[in-house]
Amino acid sequence: MGLLYEWNSDQKSKSINKHFDSINSLSIESNEDFVILENDELTLVVSISSGSIVESRLKKYPVENVDGSMGFRVFGFSDATSFKYYFKSGFTGISPSFIVKEADSNYVLLEDPTLGVSKKISFSSNPYEVAVYDSSLRGVEGKSYAGLYRSQGRSLDLKRGALEGGMMNNSSYEGVAISSELDPYTTSRLASIDEPLEVLSRSGWVAFVQKYFFAAIIGSDDYIYNYYALPKESGFYRMGYTVEGLSLNNFTYGHEHRLFIGPKIRKDLIERAQNLELAIDMGWFWFLA
């Protein structure tokens, strides 16, 4: 029994050391390439040039139960496995290169003066939600879109060791989920997407379902969306939507996207969006509430 305790303690120490090593190697600071936004629940890293949210951490859920541990990541990357997962939005048909126009700890306003488009990323009044507003002064011929871009691989920061809950983590379901007027909950593993999946719907949502925490792009009752999940291209699976019927005289001027990045708490998900609680119905459960 003593040997088992000693071995468990050694494994725990290794896990903690590995976490702090990863913090040091993957640490991103605000500079000419990135802006960091922060509130009580989330820390976000935004790529200035693309406007993508390239990392998110849940501050109230540390990876290790020790002082100095950082929160679990939903979006992020791993140099060891080349894994990447990020959020991107904008207008189809154009590829802006942004600069910072305004920034504070809880929002950033980016603009591309040449194309006349801007993007504001800010925290919503709803916990664990981010508002992303894309706009164009002159109008854009493309559609508004928002998407999750994910390479193949297991979710970041989950324990994999057998004595750390790794058996449940490794067997938990991971895949794209879409909720629409046609079907409240359809899912597909990424590797099984060999042709585009599309559905038109008012409101609804699209998400990548994973254990404990996940990201979802939530639609509005005021718009019709073409939800999609696409086969792997250039190393990434893409899941998201385009906003349909939004153009005025064939031009689109703006849209605000609603992005949830948070824990799987059933009561919260029920109140947040219709059918969003179904994202916790697959695999093993770990109740946070």
Give residue spans per PLM region.
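Soluble non-transmembrane domains of integral membrane proteins
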Residues: 38-279
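Intrinsically disordered regions, especially transient/low-confidence alpha-helical propensity segments
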Residues: 4, 202, 281-283
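Short, membrane-interfacial amphipathic segments enriched in basic
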Residues: 277-289
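Subset of Sec-pathway N-terminal targeting signals
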Residues: 1-18
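Short extracytoplasmic/periplasmic juxtamembrane "stem" segments immediately C-terminal to an N-terminal membrane anchor
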Residues: 14-35
